[in-house]
């Protein structure tokens, strides 16, 4: 195995060496064919027909390569002279053309260029790349650079246009808060339960006797010159029901005493009332019956008819319905 490996290594090395040699040889051959051509320096045959520029050939040197550049001067072309049958005209033209040729020859010989010799060192490795042709560098036009930050600053710093302020009366687009006027709550429906006490026939209730009966049943003379039943028997509490004179204006003339008389009195319970309405109605009915019994009178309804049990039930029902509202 080791011998086979050595053989392969040697074969590979030889192949690599052959490739390198072939590459060097090919590059030298290309270089010789490129720089070994003859450069002809030819001058215009019209200027000097007899003299011709020598043709020089340069062999490929081993190290330095001489490149002969051709510099071509402008040639003066000979104008063709129109021929004519007139002999005088031919002589003039030929003489002028000869003078021009004689003056032209020394000028062209003085302007004969010298060959320019340029040494080109052969690169050490590989092929020789062709000489780069001079390329005219593009002319750079310096354009003004625009700084966007400066523009932004300029825009920001530009003074705002002055606008004339005109006070325009504002329209009533502002919705003023609605003023909620608390409407007065509707007064609760009021009702009055009336019970009358009337004397027998044409009898009348005398003043002192009537006043004593009312006071003994818990009634107190007070506002509006009438009697009231209070929640407190001392007369300091709320009014539960009241008693008025049946004769208008309804006042009692207590100071007159015996001189005062009336055909009857009226008990009335206003609804709503303080406390329990049903209890207040029962208390008013009992008081009316007690006073009627003491004075010898009759208990009547609001229409001054006899108070019957059915009418009492109707009063109670009215009180219950009102309390439910």
UniProtKB/Swiss-Prot annotation:
Keywords: Cell cycle, Cell division, Cell inner membrane, Cell membrane, Membrane, Transmembrane, Transmembrane helix. One of its GO terms (biological process) is FtsZ-dependent cytokinesis. It is a single-pass type I membrane protein. SMART domains: ZipA_C (SM00771). Residues 27-325 are cytoplasmic. It is found in: Cell inner membrane. GO terms for cellular component: cell division site; plasma membrane. The keyword Transmembrane helix applies. Residues 1-5 are periplasmic. It comes from the Bacteria. It holds the Pfam family ZipA_C. The chain crosses the membrane at residues 6-26. Belongs to the ZipA family. Interacts with FtsZ via their C-terminal domains. HAMAP family: ZipA. Essential cell division protein that stabilizes the FtsZ protofilaments by cross-linking them and that serves as a cytoplasmic membrane anchor for the Z ring. Also required for the recruitment to the septal ring of downstream cell division proteins. This is Cell division protein ZipA. It comes from Aliivibrio fischeri (strain MJ11) (Vibrio fischeri). The gene is zipA.
